Amino acid sequence: MNKFITLTVACFALFVQADAASNKATVEKLYDLYENGTAREFADTYASLVAEDFDRWLGRYVGLGFRMNDDEMTVAEVVNSPAKDHLKPGDKILSVNGIKAKEGNELPFQGPLGGEVKVKLERDGKKMTVKMNRALQTNRGDKERMLGWLSTFNEEDWKDRSKVIQRNPVVADGNEVYASFESKDTNEDGNEVRWWTVERFIFNDGGQIVHHGDINEDLLIAQQNGYKLSK
């Protein structure tokens, strides 16, 4: 009996190790394609790994909880509160806190937590004003949004992607895979900007990605571009 239990445990351990090794190899392949492959090779490979219940964690921010079509200055999608209670897809933004909505103007949707945002908009031919207070938001994406983003990849833009300077060894534990790497890019002034990114992938038993999240040095990136937090 004890021999049977020992054998069962050993087989399970081998299965977990094999599964972890496969997931690790998948992430390493994605990184190799990002560094050395074409836009389509990377996008198609990633798209083939996206599970039905895929969740992309894109960080948190302070804002209103909607996505905007910057070209048309219209509301593209309402995601969270407080925007859910005040905005509708298709609303045309006219001004925000007195700042006219036009190309070149930075609209203060984001800012201090709890700060009031007064939005003048046009809906179905009628002009109106709505007031909201900024709240903590989580930026997420599902399978549809991820596949839509991957479909926009093209070889011309791919040439200008940020470059990976160095990668730490990928670490896998069962269905979870962790990786970190340093990237560099060139800003508008021609200066080199560097930052580190840490990523976490979770795979299902079929080898597809159900979760992909990352954090990076946003503050350091901003500082290298000449921005700083107010004291």
Q: For each predicted feature, which ranges?
A:
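PDZ/PDZ-like peptide-tail recognition elements
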Residues: 21-76, 82, 107-110, 133, ...
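Hydrophobic h-region of N-terminal signal peptides that target proteins for export
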Residues: 10-18
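Conserved PDZ fold ligand-binding element
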Residues: 83-103
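PDZ-domain C-terminal substructure recognizer with occasional recognition of PDZ-binding tails
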Residues: 107-144
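Sec-dependent signal peptide recognition
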Residues: 2-8
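A beta-strand edge to alpha-helix "cap/lid" segment located at domain peripheries
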Residues: 21-22, 147-231
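Extracytoplasmic
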Residues: 70-71, 114-116, 174
